[in-house]
């Protein structure tokens, strides 16, 4: 079987974009698959993804990264995943897995009472508040899924 880069299929040099423009990136651990995801995010979302990743890495220097279900996940060893994000057509959805414990609460509710969302549209977001949520979330028990 030929070696392939994460998120690339067949002879195509471009990653496959799924529904809403979310990049299809193979499951993987570490920074490399996350960087592949960020590079494949379309248009303005790519710049946003790199900003989110940078804020997370600066705020949580020992952050653990992975790609699962075509989304980058961020966590702390021994505490689980605290955040992920996903591209949609008009925005990027950030999920805080223990977001109901953050102060102030991220604005979006989820079916799971613990989870809170932040939908980021083109044009910017409050980076200071995002960094504060990341810092808080990284200290809380996270999701211990795969």
Language-model features: locations:
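Charge-dense, helix-prone N-terminal extensions
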Residues: 2-146
């Amino acid at each position: 079987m030929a070696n392939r880069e994460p998120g690339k299929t067949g002879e195509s040099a471009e990653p496959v974009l799924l529904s809403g423009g979310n990049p299809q990136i193979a499951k993987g651990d570490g920074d490399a698959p996350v960087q592949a995801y960020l590079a494949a995010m379309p248009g303005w979302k790519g710049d946003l993804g790199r900003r989110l990743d940078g804020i997370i890495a600066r705020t949580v220097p020992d952050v653990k990264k992975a790609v699962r279900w075509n989304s980058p996940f961020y966590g702390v060893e021994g505490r689980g995943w605290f955040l992920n994000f996903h591209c949609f057509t008009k925005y990027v959805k950030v999920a805080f897995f223990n977001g109901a414990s953050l102060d102030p609460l991220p604005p979006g509710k989820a079916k799971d009472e613990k989870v809170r969302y932040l939908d980021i549209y083109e044009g910017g977001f409050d980076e200071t508040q995002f960094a504060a949520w990341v810092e808080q979330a990284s200290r809380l028990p996270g999701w211990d899924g795969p």
